[in-house]
């Protein structure tokens, strides 16, 4: 009795301990189940993120992406991932935790739906990219076709331009030939007038009377004919070439006496360049003289003969009316490079009864030289100054380009422009010879001079 009681007393704590152990084991089971469920969810989220990242990241590898499916054979597997090497990764959940399972099924469905939507978006994006590439390819093909057509058009334009250039060259040559024929015809008329005048003088002396008015009219015809070298004994030099042929062959200032201006005037003679005998009518060398002058100054001349000067349009006209003259233009830039332009036919107001009223038109052709032809296009043009607009432009070219010249619309040369000393920012308003230095370089030195045509020309 006593021992049974002791046993009962001793066994009571053992029963209480057993109940407590069962309670503790049940609590641990729930905790373990919760931990496993959390790990499974975290693992599923991680795997899903990795899969999404792999879908967005286009790796250079050609391996197919892993396939994610539900495992119908094993209901305890939440997700099965099949890799490229045919191995599988199963994500399990504890079957003893039935309560969260519906939520996991919903999560699984949402993830699979998101993956399906992502695949669909990729297909749509791929279709758009293909459409864009197709459109770009069509545009490139159209551009290539357009470039080919433009190139063909350019080749046609080039052929037409070359043909026009040849025609223009032929027309220039024909113009020079006609000018020479007209000059020779005028010379013959002048010689005929001189002969008739001599006959009239003889008749007047014999008859004691005459017709002075007719004689005066005939003498008005310009006497522009060929002449012998030098001047006859006792006669006055008509230009620097006569002086040169008389034996005076030093550069300097001399007096000349043109046929139609017997009182004469002084000129500077270049006796050294290309055989000598040149009569200088323009020089630019240091910018000491203002060449932006008016009509009267350019008609009568200005400056200093030994330095910068303009001889005068009227005097140039009187000189070039005597015979067939050639023009030489010497040029120098600020790097001391030199060039020249030679025109075998030159004159001012050759066919004018009143050259000033006609604007002192220039006649020029037959270019040779090293500077390029920047004056031939001005042939036939009248002289324009800032106060006398004779050009073809809507504006006064002399005022616009700060010079005075035989402007057309407006110029390819401007030797009476501003002395700007080399390269300048303004356009074409310096001492320009465009075929040699362009329109934005003002030359250091220019000299324009004339001489009778040589026999070999």
Curated annotation (Swiss-Prot):
Top-level taxonomic group: Eukaryota
Residues in compartment: Cytoplasmic: 1-33
A cellular-component GO term for this protein: membrane
InterPro entries given in the database record: Fibrinogen-like_C (IPR036056), Fibrinogen_a/b/g_C_1 (IPR014716), Fibrinogen_a/b/g_C_dom (IPR002181), Fibrinogen_C-term_domain (IPR050373), Fibrinogen_CS (IPR020837)
Residue span(s) of domain Fibrinogen C-terminal: 231-454
Transmembrane segments: 34-54
Keywords for the protein's UniProt record, in alphabetical order: Calcium, Chitin-binding, Disulfide bond, Glycoprotein, Membrane, Metal-binding, Signal-anchor, Transmembrane, Transmembrane helix
Residues where Ca(2+) binds: 389, 391
Annotated segments matching region Disordered: 1-20, 211-235
GO function terms (MF aspect): chitin binding; metal ion binding
Cystine connections: 240-269, 397-410
Segments in the Extracellular topological domain: 55-457
Primary location: membrane
Record's function text: Acetyl group-binding receptor which shows a calcium-dependent binding to acetylated structures such as chitin, some N-acetylated carbohydrates, and amino acids.
Protein name: Fibrinogen C domain-containing protein 1
Species: Xenopus tropicalis
């Amino acid at each position: 009795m006593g021992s049974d009681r002791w046993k009962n007393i001793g066994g009571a704590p053992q029963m209480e301990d057993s109940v407590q152990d069962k309670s503790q084991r049940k609590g641990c089971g729930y905790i373990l189940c919760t931990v496993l469920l959390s790990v499974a969810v975290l693992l599923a989220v991680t795997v899903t993120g990795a899969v999404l990242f792999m879908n967005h990241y286009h790796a250079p590898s050609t391996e197919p992406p892993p396939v994610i499916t539900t495992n119908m054979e094993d209901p305890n597997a939440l997700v099965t991932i099949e890799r490229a090497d045919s191995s599988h990764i199963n994500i399990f959940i504890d079957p003893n935790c039935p309560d969260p399972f519906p939520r996991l099924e919903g999560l699984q469905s949402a993830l699979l739906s998101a993956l399906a939507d992502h695949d669909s978006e990729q297909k749509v994006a791929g279709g758009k990219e293909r459409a864009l590439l197709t459109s770009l390819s069509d545009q490139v093909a159209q551009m290539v076709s357009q470039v080919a057509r433009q190139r063909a058009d350019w080749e046609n334009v080039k052929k037409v331009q070359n043909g026009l250039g040849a025609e223009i060259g032929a027309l220039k040559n024909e113009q020079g030939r006609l000018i020479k024929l007209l000059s020779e015809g005028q010379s013959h008329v002048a010689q005929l007038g001189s002969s008739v005048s001599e006959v009239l003088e003889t008749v007047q002396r014999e008859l004691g009377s005459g017709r002075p008015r007719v004689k005066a009219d005939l003498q008005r015809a310009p006497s522009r004919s060929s002449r012998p070298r030098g001047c006859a004994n006792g006669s006055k030099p008509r230009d620097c070439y006569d002086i040169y042929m008389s034996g005076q062959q030093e550069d300097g200032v001399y007096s000349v006496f043109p046929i139609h201006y017997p009182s004469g005037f002084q000129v500077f003679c270049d006796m050294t360049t290309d055989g000598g005998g040149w009569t200088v009518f323009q020089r630019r060398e240091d910018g000491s003289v203002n060449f932006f002058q008016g009509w009267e100054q350019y008609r009568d001349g200005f400056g200093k003969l030994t330095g910068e000067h303009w001889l005068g349009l009227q005097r140039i006209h009187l000189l070039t009316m005597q015979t067939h003259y050639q023009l030489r233009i010497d040029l120098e830039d600020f790097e001391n490079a030199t060039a020249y332009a030679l025109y075998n036919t030159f004159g001012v107001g050759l066919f004018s009864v009143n050259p000033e009223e006609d604007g002192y038109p220039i006649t020029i052709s037959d270019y040779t030289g090293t500077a390029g032809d920047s004056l031939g296009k001005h042939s036939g043009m009248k002289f324009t100054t800032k106060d006398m607009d004779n050009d073809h432009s809507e504006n006064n070219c002399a005022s616009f380009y700060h010079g005075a010249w035989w402007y057309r619309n407006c110029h390819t040369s401007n030797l009476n422009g501003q002395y700007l000393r080399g390269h300048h920012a303004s356009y074409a308003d310096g001492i320009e010879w465009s075929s040699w230095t362009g329109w934005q370089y003002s030359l250091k030195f220019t000299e324009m001079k004339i001489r009778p045509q040589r026999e070999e020309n």
